[in-house]
């Protein structure tokens, strides 16, 4: 069986899934699998388990009368895709479908992806990542709230120069984790697979941050939390915004570094 490899702090609760229609927003009870016990309680950015909130409905006046959209479908018309909550196969399926649909409409117009996620299943996140790299559209990523674990990888995977964060967001990177059960041979097979995924994730972060593999390995050895400014210096994002462009302005207002604020110290390479 293919092992479900998660990044720590991944599947901690049922979250709000981006929906193409109101019927797609459903409550998924937590499954009693070993993965649900992997999320450490010390994770400050874990999403509390709760019932899904109601999805707002937007009513528009058209020449043929009123037309109602759920809020995510209305945002999709503006080429906005939301990645909210833990990333699993169902969230990945919805996000991939939206990306492919927007490319079919136009492969030149940018797509805006808003991320507020504690992370999740590695293979689900990589499915979204591969689709982002596959389509021809420029993808503008935005971190609102948090982009932890696989969420930070999707944030970094945006088009260079178009990766953004709001000023009070948090970004976190770390190595993958997983649970293995069964016979010793089965555990060894799954351990080998997670080590391969670890190297694969390191190379992806190195590609998009322009950091060396040695720096990436040292930074991701344990949970590494960053402010947006620190993530910008590390190479995960490009701009920290206060608000979008106003009328008559060409550029949005950027967060400027405070005088005397210490720079992010790069982790020293681990010595043998």
UniProtKB/Swiss-Prot annotation:
GO terms for molecular function: ATP-dependent peptidase activity; ATPase binding; serine-type endopeptidase activity. Residues 240-272 are annotated as: Disordered. Its EC number is 3.4.21.92. The modification N6-succinyllysine is found at residue 196. GO terms for cellular component: endopeptidase Clp complex; mitochondrial matrix. It comes from the Eukaryota. InterPro entries: ClpP (IPR001907), ClpP/crotonase-like_dom_sf (IPR029045), ClpP/TepA (IPR023562), ClpP_His_AS (IPR033135), ClpP_Ser_AS (IPR018215). PROSITE patterns: CLP_PROTEASE_HIS, CLP_PROTEASE_SER. The keyword Hydrolase applies. It catalyses: Hydrolysis of proteins to small peptides in the presence of ATP and magnesium. alpha-casein is the usual test substrate. In the absence of ATP, only oligopeptides shorter than five residues are hydrolyzed (such as succinyl-Leu-Tyr-|-NHMec, and Leu-Tyr-Leu-|-Tyr-Trp, in which cleavage of the -Tyr-|-Leu- and -Tyr-|-Trp bonds also occurs). GO terms for biological process: membrane protein proteolysis; protein quality control for misfolded or incompletely synthesized proteins; proteolysis involved in protein catabolic process. Disulfide bonds: none annotated. The modification N6-acetyllysine is found at residue 207. Belongs to the peptidase S14 family. Fourteen CLPP subunits assemble into 2 heptameric rings which stack back to back to give a disk-like structure with a central cavity. Component of the ClpXP complex formed by the assembly of two CLPP heptameric rings with two CLPX hexameric rings, giving rise to a symmetrical structure with two central CLPP rings flanked by a CLPX ring at either end of the complex. Protease component of the ClpXP complex that cleaves peptides and various proteins in an ATP-dependent process. Has low peptidase activity in the absence of CLPX. The ClpXP complex can degrade CSN1S1, CSN2 and CSN3, as well as synthetic peptides (in vitro) and may be responsible for a fairly general and central housekeeping function rather than for the degradation of specific substrates. Cleaves PINK1 in the mitochondrion. PANTHER family: ATP-DEPENDENT CLP PROTEASE PROTEOLYTIC SUBUNIT (PTHR10381), ATP-DEPENDENT CLP PROTEASE PROTEOLYTIC SUBUNIT, MITOCHONDRIAL (PTHR10381:SF11). This is ATP-dependent Clp protease proteolytic subunit, mitochondrial. It comes from Bos taurus. The gene is CLPP.
